[in-house]
Amino acid sequence: MKLFDKNERVIKKYWKKVNKINKINLESKNLTELINSLKTIKENITPENIDEYIPEVFAIVREVSKRVIGLRPFDVQLIGAMVLHEGKVAEMKTGEGKTLVATMPVVLNALLGKGVHLVTVNDYLAKRDAMWMGPIYLALGLRVGVINTQNKSYEVIWKNEELAKKALNENLSVWPQGFNGEFLEDEAKNKEALEAYQVELKEISRKEAYECDITYGTNTEFGFDYLRDNLVIDLEDRVQRGHFYAIVDEVDSILIDEARTPLIISGPSKTKASDYIRFNQIAKKLVKDKHFTIDEQKKSVILTDEGIEYIEKLLNIENLYDPEHVNKMYFLLNALKAHYLFKKDVDYIIHNGEIVIVDEFTGRLLPGRRYSGGLHQAIEAKEGVKIKEESVTYATITYQNYFRMYEKLSGMTGTAKTEEEEFKQIYGMEVVVIPTHKPMIRIDRDDLIYRTEDEKFEAVVKEIKKRYEKGQPVLVGTTSIEKSERLSKMLSKEKIPHNVLNAKHHEKEAQIVALAGQKGSVTIATNMAGRGTDIKLGPGVKELGGLLIIGTERHESRRIDNQLRGRAGRQGDPGESIFFLSLEDDIIRIFGGEKLEKIMNLVKIEKGEPIYHPMLTKLIERVQKKVESINFGIRKNLLQMDTVLDTQRRAIYSYREYLLSGNIDEHFNDAIDDFIERRLEEFCEKGVCNVEEIKESLKILNISLDKLPDTRNELKEYLKNLLMEKFENKKKELGEDFPKIGKFIALRVIDENWRQYLEEVEHVKEAVSLRAYGQKDPILEFKKETFRMFDEMMAKIFEQTIIYTLNIRKITDEAEKESENELKKINTQHDEFTLVNRKERRVAEKKGKKKLKVKR
């Protein structure tokens, strides 16, 4: 109870502010007056005084919303809006109107003119929400942009600008005059006003979409645009204008479920397909429990000593762990993971001869996304489909570090309280549970646990049949496509008509979800997270008990279970939820099966009979908490490593920006100073230098050197003057082309070295995870190693800048075009992160051999 007592105390404070907003009566004002009031606020608002304007701005947005789209935010929605404005997470149950809630903090913060980003999980929702709320923003004089995948961008505009402006001037309202109810049904809305305030999308450039006051888009596109902006060779080509304020919809899905999944911009590599085929054959020869074992709890594979010896014989090598065989180890581990940790129709499907990943959190297909580090190719080899070439990373960032760049970050979701600690620790965001507008009356039954999966599915079909016969709609949640299809076949056998909603049928999603609350409807769906569509009850369904939710398995996260449950009982509707489980379900079998089996044996449960008790439901919740804790630990590890990389990424990107802004002379000066200082450090002692060694080290510059002074200070001054003179001569030789050429060289040098550095960092992560078992802190080791490497990379950047600049003739148009074409070839990927997981490996010496633990 303490948790919610604290939440109630927090909510109490917001009610005082709600009362203040409610006292502002704007009904007598016409739309033109409301718009002018907001213009006046815009002229006076600053980051320092923004909170003073909350009551007035929220009241204006509420009144305008009522008049142009016919929706008036409830008092609890005002609380949600204040929570979002304060940079917190608002937990709002399904159907409580999150989309409308966001309009108030969006408008308030957009008045500062720095751009507000509204982040959604897919293109469909970005377009839908921007157009749905668009009339509010347009009426208030704000521009709305939408960014979509495939580089498409739009602006929300009036369908008929003349008609819309006329309606605003004449104070035409969707909300009928004198209507005092809380909610206006569609049939009661003023049709003339609805027609006047219609909007549409106009295609614009990406940069223009970001220049709008408000920009809607997906998490992946916001992240990729940031990475792409840091690969451009002209400042004008950048599209984003900063990271001021973001509201993330389905915030738990994006900031927690996807936190281990970095965004990667990559290009083709030179690995051969034949290597993957060869190691796929080797993996097939290995025998489980003889050559390797599987730890299902940690989803890891451990090679045995016998396995290592057998592999060494097959490969005809002496030591599998010799540095020269590192690449063989990568191929082998990926092949084993492909065979024993990744399942067809669960983790991926084969579609048109390609491996397409299935999102484990939402059940959606992720076309175009590929596992990194050669894993995707290993799965292609396993399934016998065409092996696509591996990719080289040009730029990468995790969602954790991308979203932490925003000055203010907030989020909304139906389920966040269970992850409150992670939101607080990683993002500094508190979670506030927003009260529902009407009391929630859904009945959540205790779990029913069966001995076998077969018994469980038979019971599920029996329950569906019973409810179908009385006309009650049923939504069944499954954990994989495979199980959806198994249940579908069983229902077809019983002649029960039903719809299937999973990654193979995503085109029909919105249509199917809309029908899921109708009388007699039966819908099977993989994870319902991120669906973004409310299920409204059809006529006569309330009387039958509302929508029944059946869960066929508990997920690793309680949140996903709660999201499934939350599909029923929206806005005070009746509803019911039951989970049917079995001892063969993964989470129970791996984490708690023995305890439950003992209980079932004690109470002598007959075949086909379930056991249910609140204690059992609690036991399963404890198991889920344990799994959540393990996953949180992995995400924290990833963040610690990526934060080291993030500091370096920001340093490189800010240096690129410095160069893009035209500071080429200063860059060359820095390069010369660094170049000289490093040589003096190496070849001078107590103020005296080894001149011959220095001459030898300067040969790379391709310049003739006369007699050099041998004292440190004199030599430093001599070399600085010499190189600066060469630099000035080169500038004169190239004339007005120099700024462009100098910038081009500097950027190419930085980008190529950064690309190589990212590749090397992958190997460092691998190596430090092994050191962890020599009682060394892997994070500390990673920091030490990467700081040294980063310093070496900067030295190379400065050295190469000097060499290329002093030896350049003239850049041709062809070279510039080639550079632009290279940029076009890069791909955007959102890959599973397979590196931090490697930290979980266990390595032990035994008879000169090592055991290696692989974690997915």
From Swiss-Prot:
Its EC number is 7.4.2.8. GO terms for molecular function: ATP binding; protein-exporting ATPase activity. It is found in: Cell inner membrane; Cytoplasm. It is a peripheral membrane protein. It catalyses: ATP + H2O + cellular proteinSide 1 = ADP + phosphate + cellular proteinSide 2. InterPro entries: Helicase_ATP-bd, Helicase_C-like, P-loop_NTPase, SecA, SecA_CS, SecA_DEAD, SecA_motor_DEAD, SecA_preprotein_X-link_dom. GO terms for biological process: intracellular protein transmembrane transport; protein import; protein targeting; protein transport by the Sec complex. SUPFAM superfamilies: Helical scaffold and wing domains of SecA (SSF81886), P-loop containing nucleoside triphosphate hydrolases (SSF52540), Pre-protein crosslinking domain of SecA (SSF81767). It is an enzyme of class 7 (translocase). The keyword Aminoacyl-tRNA synthetase does not apply. The keyword Cytoplasm applies. ATP binds at Q77, G95, E96, G97, K98, T99, D534. One of its GO terms (cellular component) is plasma membrane. It comes from the Bacteria. Keywords: ATP-binding, Cell inner membrane, Cell membrane, Cytoplasm, Membrane, Nucleotide-binding, Protein transport, Translocase, Translocation, Transport. Monomer and homodimer. Part of the essential Sec protein translocation apparatus which comprises SecA, SecYEG and auxiliary proteins SecDF. Other proteins may also be involved. Belongs to the SecA family. HAMAP family: SecA. Part of the Sec protein translocase complex. Interacts with the SecYEG preprotein conducting channel. Has a central role in coupling the hydrolysis of ATP to the transfer of proteins into and across the cell membrane, serving as an ATP-driven molecular motor driving the stepwise translocation of polypeptide chains across the membrane. This is Protein translocase subunit SecA. It comes from Thermosipho africanus (strain TCF52B). The gene is secA.
